[in-house]
């Protein structure tokens, strides 16, 4: 099992490193350049025109590596987690295409995105229950207590799914930020799926736990490889194509490992980023005042004088700590 996990990460890393130099010039020639909002940090204006939609680069690496190294590539677990990733990635691709190619700055309208995201969330939760017997219960973090929600499970977990995928998207605002934080989140899921396989399931009884670990490892390799081109100063951005796909991969792993609530711990950085936006909007609309210099939170620190690399490193460290706490919460429920 460990051999396949390491090889999955290595193969995804290799594919991403090979595709990067091939795809970036193509994206540049096709004028898939990023537009930068003028109200953002002024130093970001220099990034205008940087190729976007680069998420395609690591998505190819993740999918190929996961399928090649999986014990059973056609298992429902593997099909569903890849479908979740690509489904949300497709929404992001359409959004990017409208913004970059059709030059409609807002991309998909908010309600259009939400319809697609909610539909995918309901399909994922229903499919996991109907075909894989995951049930409609939630495992309480740090315990082995299962809270049965019945039909309420679907809207509740769909809310988490849509929230996390959009939160990952919000986090993709600095060079290397989303790729690095997701790398650590995926490392957590390598650990969780591996623990499930070695301990006979733990809080999640899965048929192909090791294949989910292989998928998560492939995502680690893909994100690590993408950082070669996305670290400051970025040569390419992942775009909504990449950020929504990574969010989809995370929620897919969470649903299939029955760690829907633990995901809120593992993805603590995303949660805080999303909350900062919600609080900022609420405060401005109700009082006319802003809580933060700018939201999401990473821009608040930038405008406070931190350089971009410092913000990214602090957020990476926070993501690592959240991941360790999330794995600890999972392990506590195994005993």
From Swiss-Prot:
State the source organism's domain of life.
Bacteria
Q: Which GO terms describe its cellular component?
A: plasma membrane
The primary site where this protein sits is membrane
Q: Transmembrane ranges? A: 5-25, 50-70, 78-98, 114-133, 145-165, 177-197, 200-220, 236-256, 262-282, 311-331
EC code(s) of this entry:
2.7.8.13
UniProt KW keywords: Cell cycle, Cell division, Cell membrane, Cell shape, Cell wall biogenesis/degradation, Magnesium, Membrane, Metal-binding, Peptidoglycan synthesis, Transferase, Transmembrane, Transmembrane helix
Q: Where in the cell is it found?
A: Cell membrane
InterPro entries per record: Glycosyl_transferase_4, PNAcMuramoyl-5peptid_Trfase, PNAcMuramoyl-5peptid_Trfase_CS
- Disulfide connectivity for this sequence is none
Q: Which enzyme class?
A: transferase
Q: Name one GO molecular function term.
A: metal ion binding
| Family according to the record | Belongs to the glycosyltransferase 4 family. MraY subfamily.
- Output the HAMAP family linked to this UniProt entry: MraY
Name assigned to this protein? Phospho-N-acetylmuramoyl-pentapeptide-transferase
């Amino acid at each position: 099992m460990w051999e396949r996990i390491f090889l999955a990460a290595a193969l995804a890393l290799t594919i991403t490193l090979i595709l990067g130099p091939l795809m970036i010039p193509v994206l540049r020639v096709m004028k898939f350049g990023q537009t930068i909002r003028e109200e953002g940090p002024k130093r970001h204006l220099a990034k205008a025109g940087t190729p976007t939609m680069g998420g395609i680069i690591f998505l190819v690496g993740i999918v190929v590596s996961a399928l090649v190294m999986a014990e059973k590539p056609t298992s429902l677990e593997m099909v569903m987690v890849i479908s979740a990733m690509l489904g949300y990635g497709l929404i992001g691709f359409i959004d990017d295409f409208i913004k970059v190619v059709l030059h409609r700055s807002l991309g998909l309208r908010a309600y259009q995105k939400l319809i697609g995201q909610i539909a995918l969330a309901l399909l994922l939760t229903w499919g996991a229950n109907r075909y894989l017997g995951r049930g409609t219960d939630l495992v309480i973090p740090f315990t082995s207590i299962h809270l049965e929600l019945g039909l309420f499970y679907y809207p509740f977990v769909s809310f988490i799914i849509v929230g996390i995928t959009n939160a990952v998207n919000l986090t993709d605002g600095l060079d290397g930020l989303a790729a690095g934080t997701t790398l650590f989140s995926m490392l957590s899921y390598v650990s969780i799926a591996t623990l499930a396989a070695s301990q006979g399931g733990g809080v999640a009884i899965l048929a192909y736990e090791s294949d989910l670990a292989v998928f998560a490892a492939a995502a680690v390799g893909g994100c690590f490889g993408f950082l070669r081109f996305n670290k400051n100063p970025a040569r390419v951005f992942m775009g909504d194509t990449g950020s929504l796909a990574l969010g989809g991969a995370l929620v897919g792993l969470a649903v299939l490992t029955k760690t829907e609530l633990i995901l809120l711990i593992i993805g603590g950085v995303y949660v805080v980023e999303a909350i900062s936006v919600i609080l900022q909007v609420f405060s401005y609309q109700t009082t006319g005042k802003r809580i933060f210099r700018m939201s999401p939170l990473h821009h608040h620190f930038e405008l406070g004088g931190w350089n971009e690399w410092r913000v990214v490193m602090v957020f990476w460290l926070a993501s690592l700590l959240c991941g360790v706490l999330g794995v600890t919460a999972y392990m506590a429920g195994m005993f």
